[in-house]
């Protein structure tokens, strides 16, 4: 028995350590909700700390990385924002094409996904309303409808995952503010590919085109944003017009 005791103790310690490494999504979601409460009152550093706690509980929690990216953006920590948002996107891409063992596992994943989207919808609704938040809310509601449709069909055991447009949009903005216009352009285009009605992505792409001297593309991007119902800042239109006159 004495010989067995160290073995049993070692096994217990190993089991406890293993348990600590298993992603804990429910606890991470609680930390994430608390982080967004700090975001509402612009307590960016506290929010970032809460997002990091959520990530430590579940390193696969995409939305916590998105929140951390947004918090770092607000603090003008663009390198850190890019890292968090890139990780968020890579987690979404890693899910694409994954196949479930059975239909029950697929349905459980989709129900959990809807629950997380509902969390995100509530968080966006609680933030100050703007064109940006309205567009993100529309995207989230569309994602929810897609997941609900998949649950009702019930026979698809593959994950149809793409990076949400609002993630690519935020990453593009982080790149833009870091002076990386080529990377910003790529991410704005990715946002538009994911959601053609992402008006802010069209508008931001127009700014990139303006900054890089592609005025006809800038005008097209402005028109695309307006078709999507996005209100373009008058100064952007004026800047494009004046630059076009100067080059005539």
Could you say what each language-model-derived stretch is?
Residues 33, 67, 101-102, 170, ...:
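Canonical tetratricopeptide repeat
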Residues 117-165, 217-248:
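Terminal, low-structured helical/coil segments at or just beyond the last alpha-helical repeat
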């Amino acid at each position: 028995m004495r010989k067995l005791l160290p073995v049993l103790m070692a096994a217990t310690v190993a089991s406890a350590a293993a348990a600590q490494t298993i992603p804990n999504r429910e606890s991470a979601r609680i930390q994430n909700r608390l982080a967004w409460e700090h975001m509402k009152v612009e307590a960016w550093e506290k929010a970032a700390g809460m997002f990091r706690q959520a990530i430590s509980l579940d390193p696969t929690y995409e939305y916590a990385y998105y929140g951390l990216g947004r918090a770092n953006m607000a603090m003008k920590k663009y390198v850190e924002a890019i890292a968090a948002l890139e990780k968020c996107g890579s987690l979404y891409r890693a899910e694409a094409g994954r196949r479930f063992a059975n239909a029950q596992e697929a349905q459980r994943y989709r129900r959990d996904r809807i629950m997380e989207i509902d969390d995100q919808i509530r968080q966006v609704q609680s933030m100050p309303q703007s064109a940006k938040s309205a567009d993100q809310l529309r995207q989230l509601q569309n994602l929810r409808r897609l997941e609900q449709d998949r649950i009702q069909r019930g026979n698809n055991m593959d994950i149809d995952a793409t990076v949400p447009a609002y993630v690519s949009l935020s990453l593009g903005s982080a790149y833009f503010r870091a002076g990386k216009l080529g990377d910003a352009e790529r991410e704005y285009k990715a946002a538009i590919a994911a959601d053609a009605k992402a008006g802010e992505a069209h508008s931001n792409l127009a700014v990139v085109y303006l900054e890089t001297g592609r005025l006809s593309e800038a005008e097209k991007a402005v028109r695309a944003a307006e078709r999507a119902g996005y209100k373009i800042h008058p100064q952007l239109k004026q800047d494009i017009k004046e630059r076009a006159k100067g080059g005539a």
